[in-house]
Amino acid sequence: MGFSFKAFHVDDFGCGMPVSTDAVLLGAWANLDGADAVLDLGAGSGLLALMAAQRCKAPITAIEIDPVAASACRSNFSASPWPDRINLIEADATDAEALAGKVFTHILCNPPYFETGPLSEKPGRAQARHTGSLGFLALCKLITTHLSTEGIASLVLPVESEQAFRQALTHLGLGIRQRVEVSTVEGKAPRRLLLAVSQGEDSYQHEHLAIRDVHGCYTEAMTALTRDFYLKL
């Protein structure tokens, strides 16, 4: 079970959200240059923490509330080439004691997607996908609390969630530094956004990434972004 990458394997059995293209894109795209301490916020199976460990030398903290996902994290971290560099905290990130006193130069987060709508019948998946447990305002409060002054938080969101997320950013004095619209196929409307956030006002250029071309093959940009991770690239 799970998904094998070039440098590590992720067992995501029982996790609320399995390995996804969204998470791989985020983990490969985030600018970790100069990162001194990295947080994987809502780690799930630990994929983002593992990708960060492959890409930089910084110590990495992963926090996950779901016990099944946290168990998968432990196994995945232990089996990876970097077991001594990734620390797992099994706790609710909104609990003041969970990350007390910790500050990070980079925060990675693939947050819950749905502001409204029915919850899944599976509690783990519902928790992973629904913002009822970690809304955008709570997420942005965590970013302001635990991000260093010059730090960056990188996230992936559905396009339709952008307005609600921007409202939370503005409320807490955060701004977008980089914004990439992601389309599944060249020429199609974007479905996801890759965002880099920091303190201050918005300051970014419009960028676009297509995952596949019209023939169904990965685009050159997608291949360049993920070639260090996907086995067949």
From Swiss-Prot:
Record keywords: Cytoplasm, Methyltransferase, S-adenosyl-L-methionine, Transferase, tRNA processing
UniProt cross-references to SUPFAM superfamilies, sorted A to Z: S-adenosyl-L-methionine-dependent methyltransferases (SSF53335)
Superkingdom of origin organism: Bacteria
Listed InterPro entries: DNA_methylase_N6_adenine_CS (IPR002052), SAM-dependent_MTases_sf (IPR029063), Small_mtfrase_dom (IPR007848), tRNA_Adenine-N(6)_MTase (IPR050210), tRNA_adenine-N6_MeTrfase (IPR022882)
EC numbers, comma separated: 2.1.1.223
Places the protein is found: Cytoplasm
Function according to Swiss-Prot or TrEMBL: Specifically methylates the adenine in position 37 of tRNA(1)(Val) (anticodon cmo5UAC).
Protein known as: tRNA1(Val) (adenine(37)-N6)-methyltransferase
Species, as recorded: Shewanella amazonensis (strain ATCC BAA-1098 / SB2B)
